[in-house]
Regions:
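Glycine-enriched, solvent-exposed interface loops adjoining structured elements
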Residues: 1-237
């Protein structure tokens, strides 16, 4: 993957404008700032649209004996990947996120739910029933970070240096930046946008690999430690 200045040079060539000597520090250069702005928007839109493998992360935390888990949401959290929350101490799946109605029903109920469930509210992670301290919860999530610095040590929410490397495909970023640039300038951008959407669709098909589906709806890898559950409907013979 290329750094943002290298990408900007390719973008400028496609747009038939002067290659920028820099991006972040060139605050008086309209073209450089426009490229930087549209590249940033493209990255953020891509992160919002799909769970790209490059921006998937794992978070683990240790429970406290309270509903609100103070370390339940990591820095840079954007959204959780569904059905990935597990209690590694009890070896059980953590249900959720449950609805606000279900959460309030649990709080008002005289009975205590047997299995862990969670809800996210106000940027915080809550568990019900209240867990004991010291259990390990883990889940997968999508990060808000769109790039990493030139030393590959610090992730970025926005571009701060020309040597930073975005987490997304070079050609996809070039196409996304070009069509946004053309649109902002009031010129035709339909062809570039179509090419962008087609490449994005192709990359989604290839991203992270794909598992083999069984015709019976099951999986050869079904070894998840799901807890036993009482059936919703009892059948008497």
């Amino acid at each position: 993957m290329s750094n943002i200045l290298s990408l900007a040079e390719d973008i400028a060539d496609e747009l038939l404008i002067h290659r920028p000597v820099g991006l972040v520090a060139e605050t008086d250069n309209h073209e450089a700032q426009a490229i930087l702005r549209h590249m940033t928007r493209t990255c953020r839109q891509l992160a919002a649209e799909y769970d790209w493998e490059k921006i998937q992360r794992e978070h683990t935390f240790t429970t406290v004996a309270a509903a609100e888990q103070t370390s339940g949401i990591p820095t840079g959290y954007l959204r959780m990947i569904q059905d990935t929350a597990f209690n590694r101490t009890n070896r059980e799946k953590v249900g959720g996120p449950i609805t606000k109605e279900d959460w309030q029903r649990r709080q008002a109920s005289l009975t205590v739910n047997v299995y862990d469930e969670f809800i996210m509210r106000g940027g915080k992670f809550y568990l019900t029933p209240t867990p004991p301290a010291g259990e390990t919860i883990a889940y997968e999530y999508i990060t808000r970070y769109i790039a990493i610095d030139s030393t590959a040590t610090t992730e970025r929410l926005r571009f701060e240096d020309d040597g930073e490397v975005p987490y997304f495909d070079d050609e996809l970023l070039i196409l996304g930046t070009i069509w946004r640039y053309r649109k902002a300038e009031g010129t035709d951008y339909a062809e570039e946008k179509l090419e962008y959407e087609m490449r994005k669709a192709d990359l989604i098909k290839m991203d992270g690999g794909r598992r083999v589906l069984r015709m019976d709806g099951g999986s050869a890898l079904e070894r998840y430690p799901y807890p036993p559950r009482v059936p919703e409907t009892l059948v008497f013979e």
